[in-house]
Amino acid sequence: RAAENILCHAYIRKGSLIPMNYHFTTTMAHITQYGGKVAELLYDEGFNVDSDYPFKGNMHIEKLEETIKTHGAENIPFIRVEASTNLIGGQPFSIQNLREVRAIADKYNIRVVLDASLLGENAYLIHLREEEFKDYSLGEIIKAMTDLADIVYFSARKLSSSRGGGICTNNHEIYRELEPLIPLYEGFLTYGGISVREIEAMAVGLYETLDETMIRQSPDFIAYLVNALDAHGVPMVKPAGVLGAHVNAMEICRHIPQNEYPAGALAAALFLISGIRGMERGTLSNQRDEDGNETLADMELVRLAVPRRVFTLSQIKYVVDRMAWLYENRELIGGLRFVYEPPVLRFFMGGLEPVSDWPQKLMAKFKADFGESL
């Protein structure tokens, strides 16, 4: 978030437009805070949860050029590409697509910014799915990706292993533009508000990102979880992405209107019957519009995150068992409403309550089936 704030402060002004494959919550908040707007330019496959298209995070090249022509290159300070696109199910882009984005950017003299927070996992899926790179190491793939960007920024908690983040560039002009903002907002250039201990841990974590044995553990477990839940009929985002298995709450909770937050309700129901914490990625994660109306999400997902080197396979199987039961009893799930709604990033700190007594009915059915087991 600190990196996003620095970049937005440096480049975004009122009227700026940032084309991207898809937004992330804090990215959108920072851009709008500085007066900019976002243009999301996925191909249709990116929103089709049942499509087996391998690179749903690809940016729509024709729409990108059309957007630049319509709004003017002078109003577009950079094009943002997110690795392992988070909010559509951790879906990767291909290097070929990034090359095409780079070519358009060069044509109109616009910079390319790569959100590399989930770079290692995107590289691993390129290794598996993009024929040209099947014999490349993760390090070679990551270099090919970063060579196509002017600026690379990341959350170390996602890419590496520690608190903090970073902004990288091999362009001295860009470095000089960003340089004075670091001590203003974070700390001196040599540490940026991060302790030396955390920087050392970050360096180790970045090297580990090049280790296929380490980086593949999470995607492999996620693929197992997606396939196992799919075998039970649970609607999932396919093909399996990274970061977590993503459950299609729009389909499971079709009886819940989007303004009652079906993904949030499904996550709450899962926690009640299992203690499993899923993350809502849908309308609840969006900001209201300028008139106070809900901004309905393109997708309603519950992310079942699978961190690296944390879970055993038996724990993944427990998730399958409880999620499968909940799917069979999905009609018992009801909606949610806010009792406290912060004006920004409401899903972090807001408070909600059920719109009816559906939690009691759900738990009564669970106890009838399982006894007092939780």
Language-model features: locations:
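Conserved PLP-enzyme active-site core in the AAT-like
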Residues: 1-236, 257
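Conserved glycine-rich beta-strand-loop-beta hairpin in the small C-terminal domain of fold type I
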Residues: 221-223, 237-249
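Short, solvent-exposed beta-strand edge segments and adjacent coil->beta transition regions
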Residues: 164, 242, 299-303
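Acidic carboxylate-rich catalytic motifs and surrounding loops in phosphoryl-/glycosyl-chemistry enzymes
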Residues: 156, 240, 281-284
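Active-site loop ensemble at the mouth of alpha/beta enzyme cores that anchors a bound cofactor
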Residues: 222, 249-277, 291-297
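PLP-dependent enzyme catalytic core of the Aspartate aminotransferase-like
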Residues: 273, 285-374
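Short, conserved charged micro-motifs
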Residues: 176, 254-262, 309-318
